[in-house]
């Protein structure tokens, strides 16, 4: 193997440095010390579903088309997958140069496209995904004694020990699958990603022992991969960093409602709540206006008026282990009654998904039932931007480092799919929520948040450790990896090879021509996103 790329979700120096000092991750510590390492600036927004495609294509979301865990068609939505990534991935570029690849567990790679090599998909794939080549998953399971995309028991009730065991088992499966496939296919390029280094901060965020265990398991697998695959060059990268919140929860749709931009409903026409994601049966359903509300519906309606919506009720029930029991007996219509949400068709502007970090205008002729006239678009958007730039926390601090029109952040053929206004929270210390809970500010629902800076490191052949990483950006990873293999970067790439490798120049590659987007088929993916706080 000539080049190995190791992806470690959410890895950053505030997390790694204490682990290095404690001797918990000796393999990573040695790689960082023997080669070159530094901060890697992530993109906007710095979240898994968009950032990993940016890393493995070298282009911004406006060029590859994925901005969120969700993709939208008018007011309807689906979970993103690889068919929504409309640019060539690293392994597809290498295929066109006659080089083979093995790719394991990289997010947003299902369903795989044809290339020379092997691919087992990662996050956002269903549990039994199609792999490349066909039948590969069965071979992997037979070879290593089982394989799952997600940690065993992830959707069931687990205690701390079982959760940590799940992290270890997930790391083992990634490492053993990668080594088996590398031995079988003998690729020039290998890419393996470890996801639970992020998940641990959502599930056990204050548990230093759990964090150490998750990273130690990954470090052990990296060591085994290096020993068995003996790559000439190793690159390590993350999609973003992670850290504690030090601010507030800012409820964007509450802000918009209070200023007359957003209208609300307790029926359909919006994103699903906690309850509907778990039940997997409310997409854009319409409320039945002719039916008499049940006593439970009326009670939940009253609760919603004082801020107890089903989203937070779901979190409270889950905390005491009653969420599944409640969902078994609470009728769908009662859930709808207790879920106050933005009505997309009736609103001028709304946050459709918190992971998107932005606001979408409901424009006539663009959205199915748009209310903002095209000639008013610029004025409405500028007014929104000015108002949001002035928002202050209860402590008098600015909520946002920047509030920008989308074209100031993204460029490319898919900018039209992005939010119209992009929000950059101050130091990413504020939790942006799409929920309607009465007050614009509250305590963050989660203790940790993605941060703007991850890591990049490299060691081995062709790496000039004295050159440093410069102002390394997420978009630079793909052209850097190509340079280690002597392959020119695509002219469409927004990144450039980092200073520690010798650039090979650029080349015009064929335009991307993909198949129509595939619909998500495993609603357990939605539940996982909901459990992690990515869907509210």
Regions found by a protein language model. Give the residues of each.
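Beta-strand elements within well-structured catalytic alpha/beta cores of enzymes
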Residues: 1-16, 31, 55, 94, ...
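Active-site-proximal alpha/beta segments of enzymes that process anionic O-linked groups
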Residues: 12-185, 261, 281-291, 299-326, ...
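Short catalytic/ligand-binding loop motif for oxyanion handling, primarily in non-cytosolic enzymes
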Residues: 13-15, 48-49, 64-65, 109-115, ...
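A long, amphipathic alpha-helix that forms part
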Residues: 15, 163-190, 195-236, 240-244, ...
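Secreted, luminal/periplasmic, and some membrane-associated catalytic domains
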Residues: 70-83, 87-93, 231-233, 240-428
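Polar, surface-exposed loop/tail segments
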Residues: 395-418, 469, 486-517
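Low-complexity, glycine/alanine/valine/leucine- and proline-rich hydrophobic stretches
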Residues: 424, 429-478, 482-486
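Short acidic, low-complexity intrinsically disordered linear motifs used
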Residues: 518-536
